[in-house]
Amino acid sequence: MKVLQFNQDATCCVVAASSHQISIFNCDPFGKCFEIDTKNSKKKTSNNNGSASNSESRNNEESILITNGSRDRTDAEEEEDNEDNALVTGNILKEGEFVIEMLFSTSLIAIADRGQGLNKGKKLKIVNTKRKCTICEIVFPHEIVDVVMNRKRMCVLLESDQIFIYDISCMKPLETIDLWEDHYKRSQANSFSNASNTGTLEGDSANLNRVATNLLANATQKSVNGSNPSVRTRRNSLRSKIRPRMVLSNDDRSILCFTAYSSPKKNKPNSEALYDVVIYDTLNVTPVNYLNSVHKGNVACLAVSHDGKLLATASDKGTIIRVFHTGVDSDYMSSRSLFKEFRRGTRLCNLYQLAFDKSMTMIGCVGDTDTIHLFKLDDASNSLPGDNSSNGHWNEEEYILASNSNPSMGTPKEIPLSKPRIANYFSKKIKSSIPNQNLSRNFAYITVNESNRSCLGFPDEFPNQVYIASDDGTFSIYSIPSKPGECVLTKNNKFT
């Protein structure tokens, strides 16, 4: 399958079995409800002044072309892109590789076809499936990597590590987040801070602040003009394992969570790592929280709960799944951001999907193994951070995570320097601050064919069921057991 994914509430499943054909199936009752052939569909043409015309105009359907930072291209640029198209299509991207996102069970769907070359991969179509027409097209300056949306916002991630945020009611651009530029500016600010602390820079505080402001302004200007190759020419999203991820909550709060580049380490000044996660309120267009070093490795998979209060993460190792409080609650404590931890297994795994159910009682995990795991969030056997009953052994990664999130870990001056008192103090502090090493395993599991890629969906209407769609064209419904064990297959269908 070129595309295989559920919509936000698992009422529909999007399938692209061939290079140019996209189908949408209802999950209950099961059946095909929409189909489009992108190869034979009528093309839209635009004139020189940027307006657009569409063959659907005969039916009085309006079609709009929106550009974001694009301009008229020269012959040399077109020729260069044609060469890039041949390289990318032949060696990296398979023909007909789509980026698709549905808007729940409505008639709106966003489609980007990356398999038709770089130029086509920069164009996002908003399609009305009932009227079978394109409502609008948005042209971006770089290829589209991912699209997420809910009833309030649409967010588009580009290969240039930029996130465009739109008001979905009118497709008005609200904000552009540049992940790589922000990382560069943070690195420059850290360098400046270190230099000022060590006395490398001399002068009063006002002069130092002026130097810092000019430094950040120059970094921003260079990125805009394209004169800073470390900021703007980086193109890794489709070609590297290190790739930014983003997820958007389904409710109207519209909480966006995306991975961010970590500040380079002292021994690796040019290192690039996605260890951090940013929590962003797209409704008010403002950041909410910053989770630092959620994993020791690069964050490879994200999931956010329906209301945006919980965030699940997994690294490129795929052995441990962590659940964090996002910080959108008024009673949020930054020192207690880690909520739960689960161990998927000891064997390394490439995880490509995490998913919460709507009630936030369960989280599903899908990877390139023969098992799909379901973890229970309300399982009392999995001790919370800060539970004084924790008495396991702690590894280095967990200690670093806890000490970073809890700066208060340390020996108070008022404690007498006696060995028993110090040992007792550290024992209590460590037990109250570090998660249990004896992490909970899955509550339920589903055995699948390891050679087939699968995706998972929790239907809102049936809380005790889970949907599984596989590359071999099967759609399966499983019943979640009341006690720990294997899920029971109740129904099986084929995408035909």
UniProtKB/Swiss-Prot annotation:
InterPro entries: PROPPIN, WD40/YVTN_repeat-like_dom_sf, WD40_repeat_dom_sf, WD40_rpt. Residues 46-57 have a biased composition (Low complexity). A motif (L/FRRG motif) lies at residues 342-346. WD repeats lie at residues 294-334, 346-385, 448-488. GO terms for molecular function: phosphatidylinositol-3,5-bisphosphate binding; phosphatidylinositol-3-phosphate binding; phosphatidylinositol-4-phosphate binding; protein-macromolecule adaptor activity. Signal peptide: none annotated. Required for cytoplasm to vacuole transport (Cvt) vesicles formation and mitophagy. Involved in binding of phosphatidylethanolamine to ATG8 and in recruitment of ATG8 and ATG5 to the pre-autophagosomal structure. Protects ATG8 from ARG4-mediated cleavage. Essential for maturation of proaminopeptidase I. Belongs to the WD repeat PROPPIN family. This is Autophagy-related protein 21. The gene is ATG21.
